[in-house]
Amino acid sequence: MPTDIRFGPFFSVGEVEMARDEYYFKWTAIGYRVELHLNETMDDRGRRVWFVVGKRYEPTTRKEKGI
């Protein structure tokens, strides 16, 4: 069963892309499958903010689990 992922807010595209890449590499390196995308919205002051959203799937095979 996948785990929902949502983290942020980030106030620049560079920050949110760096966070997404860091999270992706961290979790795929230990065997998880990760689907991430960026979500852009506006805060209460009308500024653009971004979140990283997606799903993380548990390793399903013994090889993926490192067994």
Where are the regions a protein language model picked out?
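A short, charged, amphipathic alpha-helix used as a generic interaction element across diverse proteins
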Residues: 1-5, 10-37
